[in-house]
Every structure is written in structure tokens, then in C-alpha cells.
Regions:
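A short N-terminal helical cap/helix-turn-helix that marks the beginning
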Residues: 41-43, 51-65, 82-107
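Structured binding elements
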Residues: 167
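Conserved AMP-binding/adenylate-forming core of the ANL superfamily
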Residues: 38-41, 103, 107-161, 178-183
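Charged, compositionally biased N-terminal leader segments and the immediate start
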Residues: 1-22
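Active-site charged/polar residues at nucleotide-handling catalytic sites that mediate phosphoryl
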Residues: 189-190
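AMP-dependent adenylate-forming
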Residues: 23-24, 28-30, 92-120
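A short N-terminal interaction module
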Residues: 15-61
Length: 192
């Protein structure tokens, strides 16, 4: 990647940092000369770009897609990965099972009082699977909308991933919304 200095930018990476960056790794994997060529080729052939990005990011599918995108209804109505089936839990947790990453921290947390904790991929997986089974035992399943109203603690990641694991839809809620907007969101989303 060619280093092009811009005088009005406060911080610029070193050439070494650029050479080892994820964008440079992507440029190399895409088989293009530099960032400008990547942009040009992506603009000319979005299907090539997104297929390349999905492979580079190692996004897994239970069922491979037939076509990466369909823009026939217009750019604002693009359909992605037609025929494919995937799940966020597959890509955040499951694909790392039986790898060195499995025992590494997925979440680091520090309370306002300064207490620190972490959850490894494996520990998070156990909690996600337990909660997913609990949700299923309550009769919740694929396609159901489930409101998630929790503070930013590690358990919110457990709940979010458990909801997604069963194929349900998360309706994220925030205490700053107030009661009436929360009721509207739950009703509009047909939350169970």
C-alpha cells in the first residue's frame, strides 16, 4: 500500500504498521495492487468484492449461498447471500471450537467499582447454550422476537447470543428510552 501523507490528519500510521494492517492483508488476498485499485474493482464488481470479503473474514455458512447479492430491486433493497444460511453464533463462537482461541477471553469486564472479570469463548458458550435451552423450554423459537432490556454487563452478551442461537430476533432496549418507547418497540416487534 502506498503511503500518501495528508497534512490535515492528526495521526498517520507508520509504513510498517500499514504493511501489517488488516486492510493490507485484505488487499493482498484480493489480488489487487493497492487500496485505490481495491476501491475501483469493488465499485465495478460488487459481487467480486463481497465474495472476497466473506472469504477473507472467514464467515461460515450452514448452507452456502448461491449468489452473494441481488441488486435487481435497487441498491436500497439489496438481498444478501441468497440461498445461504448462517448464524451470528456460528461465526462468533462455534467456528472457534477446537481451536487455540477457544480458551482465550471473549469478554473482559470491569465494574464501576474496579472489579475485573473475563469469560473465555468456552465459558461463554456454556452459558449461551444453557440460556438457549432455557428459552426453548419457555416455548421460544426461530422467528420469535424477544425484548432484551439489560445493563451493559457480560450477561447481556450471553442473552443476545442465546436469543440468536435459537434463531429468534433480538429487540434491544435501553433504559434511556423510557417506559412508553419501550412499550412501543415491544408491541411493534411483536415481542413474546
Amino acid at each position: 500500500m502506498e503511503f500518501k501523507p495528508y497534512p490535515d490528519i492528526v495521526w498517520q500510521p507508520t509504513k510498517e504498521l500499514l504493511a501489517n494492517s488488516q486492510i493490507q492483508k485484505f488487499i493482498n488476498a484480493a489480488g489487487v495492487a493497492d487500496y485505490d485499485e481495491l476501491l475501483t474493482k469493488a465499485d465495478q464488481d460488487p459481487e467480486w468484492f463481497w465474495n472476497t470479503a466473506i472469504k477473507f473474514l472467514d464467515i461460515k455458512f450452514y448452507q452456502p449461498y448461491d449468489k452473494v447479492l441481488d441488486q435487481s430491486k435497487g441498491i436500497e433493497w439489496v438481498e444478501w447471500c441468497l440461498g445461504g444460511k448462517t448464524n451470528l453464533v456460528l461465526n462468533c463462537l462455534d467456528k472457534h471450537r477446537d481451536t487455540a482461541i477457544w480458551s482465550k477471553p471473549f469478554i473482559h469486564h470491569e465494574t464501576e467499582a474496579g472489579k475485573k472479570s473475563s469469560l473465555s469463548y468456552a465459558e461463554l458458550d456454556v452459558k449461551v447454550c444453557q440460556l438457549a435451552e432455557g428459552l426453548r423450554s419457555l416455548g421460544l423459537s426461530k422467528g420469535d422476537a424477544i425484548g432484551l432490556y439489560m445493563p451493559m454487563i457480560p450477561e447481556v452478551a450471553v442473552a443476545f447470543l442465546a436469543i440468536i442461537k435459537i434463531g429468534a430476533v433480538v429487540i434491544p432496549l435501553f433504559s434511556g428510552f423510557g417506559p412508553d418507547p419501550i412499550i412501543v418497540r415491544l408491541n411493534d416487534g411483536k415481542a413474546k
